[in-house]
């Protein structure tokens, strides 16, 4: 009986989230510097997308993989790995459909870096990471995700306490941007999108992940004790 109630609650929450997304008029959301909002207007592929652009669906196995890798690396930091002190706060990151939908809209532009606004009513300044892939042919979706995760995870060799403590609003010094955003104690949710296309003889892909905050940094203070999310503690004790 309990499992049935939990399933119904999760289904209701998901339906509510989709309804909220559909009800938002992104053209009316305020954006810094009069930037256009990625969610405003028609959802069409840009000219930069070349031939045969396609948005790939991220299945549950894909979203679970992304969340698992992000939360695993957050667990490592929470426990004081990589020579860093234990984090004072470290929430478990969850999947957010609105962030995912806006990430998908971004990938349909087929350009990694744009100045488009991606604010939502719940998240004022979402962070964003982009992974570009070019080869003779494209691998399966899971392989693309694994390649992006590996690229970010390798940045652990560049990370240090000095870099963590000297974070600035426009990002940290050093080649640690992807890993740093995933480690931010201000991040609580993520959503990703993936678009592929043909560029002459080359196959290309753009994987974009929007995070609930773009403010980088991890609270390394342990003076008041270690404060971890209960789910994070459960994961650490598994």
Swiss-Prot record:
Residues 1-23 form the signal peptide. SUPFAM superfamilies: PR-1-like (SSF55797). Disulfide bonds: none annotated. Residues 67-211 form the SCP domain. It holds the Pfam family CAP. One of its GO terms (molecular function) is toxin activity. It comes from the Eukaryota. Gene3D superfamilies: CAP. Keywords: Cell adhesion impairing toxin, Hemostasis impairing toxin, Platelet aggregation inhibiting toxin, Secreted, Signal, Toxin. InterPro entries: CAP_dom, CAP_sf. A motif (Cell attachment site) lies at residues 32-34. Expressed in salivary glands. The keyword Coiled coil does not apply. One of its GO terms (cellular component) is extracellular region. The keyword Secreted applies. It is found in: Secreted. Inhibits platelet aggregation induced by all agonists tested (ADP, arachidonic acid, the thromboxane A2 analog U46619, thrombin, and snake venom snaclecs (TMVA that activates platelet through GPIB, and stejnulxin that specifically acts through GPVI (GP6))). May act by competing with fibrinogen for binding to glycoprotein IIb/IIIa (ITGA2B/ITGB3). Belongs to the CRISP family. This is Tabinhibitin 5. It comes from Tabanus yao (Horsefly). The lineage of its organism: Eukaryota, Metazoa, Ecdysozoa, Arthropoda, Hexapoda.
């Amino acid at each position: 009986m309990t499992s049935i109630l939990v399933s119904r609650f999760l289904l209701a929450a998901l339906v509510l989230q989709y309804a909220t997304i559909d009800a938002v008029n992104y053209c009316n959301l305020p954006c810094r510097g009069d930037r256009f909002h990625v969610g405003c207007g028609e959802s069409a592929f840009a000219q930069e997308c070349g031939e045969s652009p396609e948005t790939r669906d991220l299945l549950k196995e894909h979203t679970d993989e992304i969340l698992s890798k992000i939360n695993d690396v957050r667990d490592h930091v929470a426990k004081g790995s990589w020579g860093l002190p234990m984090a004072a706060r470290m929430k478990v990151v969850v999947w957010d459909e609105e962030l995912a939908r806006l990430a998908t809209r971004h990938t349909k532009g087929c350009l990694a870096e744009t100045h488009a606004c991606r604010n939502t009513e719940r998240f004022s300044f979402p962070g964003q990471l982009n992974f570009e892939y070019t080869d003779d042919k494209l691998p399966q979706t899971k392989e693309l995700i694994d390649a992006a995760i590996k690229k970010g995870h390798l940045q652990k060799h560049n990370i240090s306490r000095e870099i963590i403590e000297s974070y600035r609003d426009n990002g940290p010094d050093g080649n640690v941007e992807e890993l740093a955003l995933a480690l931010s104690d201000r991040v609580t949710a993520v959503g990703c999108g993936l678009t592929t296309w043909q560029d002459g003889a080359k196959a290309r892909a753009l994987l974009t992940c929007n995070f609930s905050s773009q403010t980088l940094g991890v609270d390394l203070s342990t003076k008041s004790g270690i404060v971890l999310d209960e789910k994070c503690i459960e994961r650490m004790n598994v």
